[in-house]
């Protein structure tokens, strides 16, 4: 966490992929998600009071069956993921996207007022992935990258002035993924 007190992580220790927090020394481990499904990719807000993550939650009996069969093999099928926010202790959890496909790699903007995430929701074939910005309640989804490939894993410099993301743009057809850094001016 930005306040230097907690770590957030995904673990299978309870028989499902859930989020946990703990102190930096490994003490006070607490499970903070409990619904069946694949919870992961969590980040704390800049003030350490909120968390954001992506989850794939099976909803139908068939989805649950497939999820459990894959999980038993140590696999997941993260093709349908949505973005969630909660208090840092996991309370008041809310799904804030309902746009379908894979919405993942969410992170808070430096001011804590928006969430940036990767998604393929606009594309029939599930590709490309671009970056989108939205308010904390999921409203105002705005596309901020316009590449025909893969843009994901948004992050910010500690001072909030630089924006960093991974992309396979400009790779000469090699499928290499590189880091890109630019000024953040929101």
Model-identified regions with their sequence ranges:
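Sequence signature of WD/YWTD-type beta-propeller architectures
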Residues: 1-186
């Amino acid at each position: 966490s930005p306040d230097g007190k907690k770590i957030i992580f995904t673990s299978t220790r309870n028989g499902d992929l859930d989020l946990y927090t703990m102190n930096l020394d490994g003490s006070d481990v607490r499970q903070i998600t409990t619904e069946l499904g694949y919870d992961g990719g969590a980040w704390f807000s800049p003030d350490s009071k909120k968390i954001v993550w992506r989850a794939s939650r099976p909803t139908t009996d068939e989805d649950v069956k497939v999820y459990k069969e894959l999980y038993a093999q140590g696999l997941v099928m993260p093709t349908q993921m949505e973005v969630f926010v909660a208090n840092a202790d996991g309370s008041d959890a809310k799904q804030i996207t309902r746009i379908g496909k894979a919405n993942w790699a969410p992170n808070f903007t430096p001011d804590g007022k928006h969430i940036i995430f990767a998604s393929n929701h606009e594309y029939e074939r599930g590709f490309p992935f671009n970056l989108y910005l939205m308010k904390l309640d999921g409203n105002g989804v705005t596309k901020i990258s316009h590449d025909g490939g893969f843009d994901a894993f948004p992050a910010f410099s500690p001072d909030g002035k630089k924006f960093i993301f991974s992309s396979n743009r400009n790779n000469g057809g090699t499928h290499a993924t590189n880091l890109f850094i630019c000024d953040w001016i929101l």
